[in-house]
Amino acid sequence: MPRNIEPLDLGIQIPYHFRCPISLELMQDPVTVCTGQTYDRASIESWVSIGNNTTCPVTRAPLSDFTLIPNHTLRRLIQEWCVANRSNGVERIPTPKQPADPTSVRALLSQASAITGTHVSVRSRAAALRRLRGFARDSDKNRVLIAAHNATEILIKILFSETTSSELVSESLALLVMLPITEPNQFVSISSDPGRVEFLTRLLFDSSIETRVNAAALIEIVSTGTKSADLKGSISNSESVFEGVLDLLRNPISSRRALKIGIKTLFALCSVKSTRHIAITAGAPEILIDRLAADFDRCDTERALATVELLCRTPEGCAAFGEHALTVPLLVKTILRVSDRATEYAAGALLALCTAEERWREEAAGAGVVVQLLLMVQSECTERAKKKAQKLLKLLRDSWPDYNSFANSDDFGCSSQVVPF
């Protein structure tokens, strides 16, 4: 085989042995398989997992052992070559973090859950949890590996049995919310236990902002993953839980993660119809509108608007949002500005408000909503959004010029019922 092959897109020749035989790309994390052939880790892992391939791609010999051994020598040579060719636009490949070893994961979980024994202490258990968190931060693969070793059950036990140790609570909670959900009902042991729900609620007021955010994240995970309506209601049937979550959104120094987790959790809690009045009493309408007018990104804006629409489906919600001076202008401005989903939720909230009181119909018309709605009907937004626009146009017919010329067309023939999203 030739020592060098034709360049890809760098304008220079890449040494043949620096390229992965599968992807033909410069290797970022070279590993050697049992046949002695070296590949880029991502490529050989994909080769083995897709189609259940059990042969070496180059030699066609059976892969009797799937252990991947890092080729540090080759990786250093590639890094040196990258540095030597920096003037040609080649960036040095980073030194990859090695994936977690199953044996190490088992040992660390055992150490973290140990209660008695030689050298067992809160400090040693917390250190084990921190190492596991480090593995979890590195990659999705590590998170899946940790979860596969019954980590969720172990961490739940630590979290709710070691309540006197703030260090163990914060570390176990932080790791728990990083792991993937492997079973639909794996958090039922939390949602079905009022004491555990109450403890999580108390953590929303912890002195550590990280613990508060992680507590909110776990509440969102538990609420979303709970199928029983009664258990969902038991989680959100508390003004304290709403106050704690809303405080994450209210805090002027909230981090981007705090805002994202806060709105996700608020939406999950407000999905329970029977407890939406608690969110309204806790001040959700004012905080949502203030945040929407300030610093949500697109995804968070969509979720916040969906929450606004949910709360506007109650009379007290309409009243609270309607009294905020920015609500109607902000909702009108959002239409066709952010995304199709945001447009749909904004239109749904406006529909609820305009159905409730004439003064909000007048305010919406004054803010230019009729033109926005006419554009919505002709746009490529969702059918649900168009139906909401059509209903709003019916309600606002007195604000239309020449209403009778097209009010009865097929485009606007629909009922006035709020369409669920």
From Swiss-Prot:
Kindly name one Pfam family recorded for this protein. Answer: U-box
Q: Check the record and name the InterPro entries matching this protein.
A: ARM-like, ARM-type_fold, PUB22/23/24-like, RING-Ubox_PUB, Ubox_domain, Znf_RING/FYVE/PHD
What is the organism of origin for this protein? Arabidopsis thaliana
Q: What is this protein called?
A: U-box domain-containing protein 25
Listed PROSITE patterns: U_BOX (PS51698)
U-box domain: residues covered: 13-88
Q: Which reaction does it catalyse?
A: S-ubiquitinyl-[E2 ubiquitin-conjugating enzyme]-L-cysteine + [acceptor protein]-L-lysine = [E2 ubiquitin-conjugating enzyme]-L-cysteine + N(6)-ubiquitinyl-[acceptor protein]-L-lysine
Functional description taken from the UniProt entry: Functions as an E3 ubiquitin ligase.
Which pathway is recorded for this entry? Protein modification; protein ubiquitination
* EC supergroup of this enzyme: transferase
Q: Which UniProt keywords apply?
A: Transferase, Ubl conjugation pathway
* Xref: SMART domains: Ubox
Q: Does the keyword Transferase apply?
A: yes
Q: Name one GO molecular function term.
A: ubiquitin protein ligase activity
UniProt cross-references to SUPFAM superfamilies, sorted A to Z: ARM repeat, RING/U-box
Gene3D superfamilies for this protein? Leucine-rich Repeat Variant, Zinc/RING finger domain, C3HC4 (zinc finger)
Q: What is its EC number?
A: 2.3.2.27
> What are the BP-aspect GO terms?
defense response to other organism; protein ubiquitination
